[in-house]
């Protein structure tokens, strides 16, 4: 599996064949291989990659990076691999750049949506609310949530006010429009979850469209 970490820069548009296409610009990589995990010791195949250099680091992480002979990195994530043959193609300290992807390729993007705090049912779930009339006693309340005599309770899992946003979301099969290797920029068709500057994970698609 191909994967790289990045930061969302923002959205703009490109004109291709006189057609306006909304795109998202992501600054992705370079990432560095910090650790290799094999089935004999760890029980599975994976590599640990780091992203964004860090000035200050605690003692345990300092030893971890010193063993890999790479500079301290802010973010660490694992890439699961299928077998040891794929694991052998990576080396500790190896740099992973955007050249692993090509324009026209499909990718999956994982990000964290904007956190909107404690929100009511209308904003969080799109409830219609009550009548907007003078005689109405409620305008933005949830209304009837359960039954009266039987079962005389509200079932668990009912949509109610609560924390809205800040959830991990994956968008599948976004098309790579353009790649700028010199500036580590990736241009993707459509929108990507998260605020500007938030972490995103770009990886090869789990499922392909027929």
Curated annotation (Swiss-Prot):
Pfam family, one: Ribosomal_L3
Signal peptide: none
Any single GO BP term: translation
Keywords: Ribonucleoprotein, Ribosomal protein, RNA-binding, rRNA-binding
UniProt entry tagged with the keyword rRNA-binding: yes
One cellular component (GO) term of this entry: cytosolic large ribosomal subunit
Similarity comment: family membership: Belongs to the universal ribosomal protein uL3 family.
Protein's name according to its UniProt entry: Large ribosomal subunit protein uL3
């Amino acid at each position: 599996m191909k994967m790289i970490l990045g930061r969302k820069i923002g959205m703009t548009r490109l004109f291709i064949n006189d057609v306006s296409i909304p795109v998202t610009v992501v600054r992705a990589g370079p990432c560095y291989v910090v650790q290799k995990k094999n089935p004999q010791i760890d029980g599975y195949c994976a590599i640990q990659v780091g992203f964004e250099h860090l000035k200050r680091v605690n003692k345990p992480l300092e030893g971890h990076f010193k063993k890999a002979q790479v500079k301290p990195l802010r973010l660490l994530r694992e890439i699961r691999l299928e077998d040891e043959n794929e694991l052998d193609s990576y080396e500790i300290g190896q740099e992973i750049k955007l050249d692993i992807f090509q324009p026209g390729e499909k990718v999956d993007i994982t990000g964290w949506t904007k956190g909107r705090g404690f929100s009511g049912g209308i904003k969080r779930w799109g409830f219609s609310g009550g009548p907007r009339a003078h005689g109405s006693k409620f305008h933005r309340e949830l209304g009837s949530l359960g039954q009266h005599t039987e079962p005389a309770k509200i079932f668990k899992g009912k949509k109610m006010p609560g924390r809205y946003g800040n959830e991990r979301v994956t968008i599948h099969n976004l098309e790579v429009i353009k790649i700028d290797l010199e500036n580590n920029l990736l241009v993707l068709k459509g929108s990507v979850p998260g605020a500007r500057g938030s972490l995103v994970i770009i990886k090869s698609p789990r499922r392909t469209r027929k």
